[in-house]
Regions:
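Alpha-helical, largely C-terminal catalytic domains
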Residues: 33, 103, 162, 166
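Auxiliary, metal-adjacent structural segments of Zn-dependent hydrolase domains
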Residues: 33-82, 89-93, 137, 141-142
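Active-site recognition of the HExxH zinc-binding catalytic motif
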Residues: 97-110
């Protein structure tokens, strides 16, 4: 079961009861301040073309938004990535983990569902959990990023997991998500590697 509440103008998701092995709270209620984002890896820290090429492998388009402009389709606002259809929107100050998380929401959807997406990709807990795993794998496919950095930035942003960190979740507590991703043709098991 999942409940939604408003806190400081943000949607904060909490799951009231979850099976063993799943994410306890997808995003924690924290006040995001500019200093927090400055410590995270952002799109301006890596090559835009590398990220665009990675997303294109999954039929997605990355659209650069000018600095200081609002990001279309951003669920969280500020510098967080946005989604409209098969396009991911990001600015130079968008955290890479945010861009990958939102892109993964589209990647796990079939094309007919992607076309309907605007801002909020899913209400599926299974998809949300799988996205947390997939974004770390995509991090390894981007020069200058890497899964370790993506997982650390997820923790800093405020994701909360039962085992205490995003890395512990992905490595020790996400078997159902790995199985879900494999069933949807996105990862190979037991290697735990990307198919594309």
């Amino acid at each position: 079961m999942r409940s939604t509440r408003r806190s400081s103008g943000r949607n904060v998701l909490f799951q009231a009861s979850r099976p063993v092995g799943a994410v306890r709270a997808i995003r924690a209620s924290i006040a995001l301040i500019p200093e927090t984002f400055r410590t995270m890896l952002t799109l301006s820290d890596i090559a835009f073309d590398d990220v665009a090429a990675l997303l294109a492998r999954y039929g997605l388009r990355l659209e650069r938004v000018a600095d200081g402009e609002p990001i279309p389709g951003s669920y969280w606002g500020e510098c967080e990535a946005g989604l409209i259809g098969s396009t991911v929107y990001a600015r130079g100050d968008t955290p890479v983990h945010s861009l990958l998380h939102e892109a993964c929401h589209l990647i796990v959807l079939p094309p007919e569902r992607r076309a309907q997406v605007h801002t909020d990709a899913t209400d599926s807990i299974e998809e949300e959990d799988a996205v947390c795993v997939l974004q770390s794998l995509l991090g390894d496919a981007i020069p200058g990023a890497g899964s370790e950095r993506i997982l650390a930035d997820m923790d800093e942003w405020g994701y909360t997991f039962r085992l205490g960190s995003a890395r512990a979740y992905v490595e020790q507590d996400a078997e159902s998500s790995w199985q879900w991703l494999a069933a949807h043709g996105l990862v190979k098991l037991p290697e735990r590697s990307l198919i594309r």
